[in-house]
């Protein structure tokens, strides 16, 4: 297993000042000033020109090209941007400190332009600079610089991608984030499942467990420094906490019977999970500081897959208390639960694996009915149900940090195995997420740059 200390977030990079530093000579735009507007539900991607990041010296050329490629791929995969082929460029940028000739970029129908530079500093660090231009108005929308160790150049590319996304859409991006998932290798009857973690675009895969025991349902803590998951080892399955920085793990409550479907509270102080007792399962929450446990449901049914609302006041969960698996919502401290899943076109449909959006506006779910497994979203009151994608076996949705994209896994059956896919909440731009092998049970981390002080 890789040295977990080498992947801790706090060592990734150093930003100038107390946060994101504006470049000298750049223009800082006030929140209310004009900027490009992109409706995330709009079907026409915005044409954007992304020039190669200039090298500060000949030895910086490869990393500059790498940063350019990562930014291009991020924006293209979002579905909101259409990067223009560099072969169409009329102007070749040679100095990012000089305003471009905007007519050259209008001619190739670019609405936005990204320029940048990568320079190795005397102390060995990399300095990354970028500019974002509104080609139509001729305004500079953003200009910032970052310093980082050379090995973390990809992270800089993701952060720049987020800055471009936010400046053009008015919403936070999601590129500077990770995904934890279950990596699957070997024949189906002897499948080895390991806990794995990667960047949201599939790069930098790291294996966190050796595969000697079966692992399921990994979930990030709010500060992205811990993962909770279920493991089938000696005896009953147990819920574990894994510390990414130290590589250490511990059992979350040594309960008799099986514990499963763990998830952190939004403040990271508690873990909610399902505990099997006889033929039924109920929801429990454990305070991670005091290790005290509170029972939230007490029914003869199977209550599982709990997920907190972003403000921590409510939970959604899956229960078969009405005879079929459906989604319910109740107060985080327990009490009466309200069913919110009611299929209008298939009264026999079942709902499972609910998860609350970080924005609080939707609950994503898996719906089974008519021989199909669908990934969908609905509002927390059950209204506005929308199926985004359907197939033989789609399951386990997880939201991006900005709540605009879902990742899930699809298993085609047969002798093969599952793969990860993403789709936006309007149901378009479905993409396969690259992984080394078969993969299931994805969970998206919060935006790493937003958790730097936690």
Swiss-Prot record:
> Which positions form S-S bridges?
none
SUPFAM superfamilies (UniProt xref): TolB, N-terminal domain, Tricorn protease N-terminal domain
Broad class of where this protein is predominantly found:
periplasm
Lineage: superkingdom: Bacteria
- Indicate whether Cell cycle appears among the record's keywords: yes
InterPro entries to which the protein is assigned, alphabetical:
6-blade_b-propeller_TolB-like, PD40, TAT_signal, Tol-Pal_TolB, TolB_N
- Which Gene Ontology CC terms are recorded? periplasmic space
Where can this protein be found?
Answer: Periplasm
Does the keyword field hold Cell cycle?
Answer: yes
Q: Which Pfam families match?
A: PD40 (PF07676), TolB_N (PF04052)
Oligomeric and partner information: The Tol-Pal system is composed of five core proteins: the inner membrane proteins TolA, TolQ and TolR, the periplasmic protein TolB and the outer membrane protein Pal. They form a network linking the inner and outer membranes and the peptidoglycan layer.
Q: Which family does it belong to?
A: Belongs to the TolB family.
* Protein function: Part of the Tol-Pal system, which plays a role in outer membrane invagination during cell division and is important for maintaining outer membrane integrity.
**Full protein name:** Tol-Pal system protein TolB
What's the source species for this entry? Bradyrhizobium diazoefficiens (strain JCM 10833 / BCRC 13528 / IAM 13628 / NBRC 14792 / USDA 110)
